[in-house]
Amino acid sequence: SIFNFGLAISASIADFNNDGFEDIYVSNDFSTPDFLYINNGNGTFTDKIKESTNQTAFYGMGTDAADINNDGLIDLMQVDMAAQDNRRQKANMASMNPELFWSTVNAGFHHQYMYNTLQLNRGTVNGTPIFSNIAFAAGVASTDWSWCPLFADFDNDGRKDLFISNGTRKEVNNRDYFKQVDKISGQEQLNQSLALSLEMPEEPIDNYIFKNNGNTTFSKANEDWSLSH
């Protein structure tokens, strides 16, 4: 059965355990856990997310699957909403709540962190794919409010590079803005709702593009590949 509840944002279909059957990774937003449905080959699937990886993203957005190191195993990229610089992180994201984190884990959900994940496929154990999250080591853990990753060989060197689409029209999570709004009474907020929405800050953010360095790390290539504002 794959009829599980989740705030699903995307799904990637690939043969993660190299058994000839397509599996399904479902990326879920907020505390609802991701699912990794392994194809049993008989029309049924089994969720193996906890057996396959130690951690996932929290605000899970888009995903893409590809072999990033040409070892014949399919890896997975999942984007979240962590800004690359400290100023934007503090302005737009609350700190992780340890009490909420552990209550979620103790309720049977997975370990989820507010950063991108790059799940490097290490092979299989009894038909279950085993992943290591190398997003920080690879240099792709924080790419702002990201929507979807795309792997492709953009420079034609035989390795999968990474494009990430980003951005929102307004800074809808800007904490300084909401601190100012909170100073206005509830009725006045209703009366001035349109004016207040127009005052919401905005900050253009580049889409990100990363060159695959061939050693499971990536380098941001926006300037070199003319993909900056």
Label every PLM stretch briefly.
Residues S1-H229:
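Acidic, glycine/proline-rich Ca2+-coordinating loop motifs
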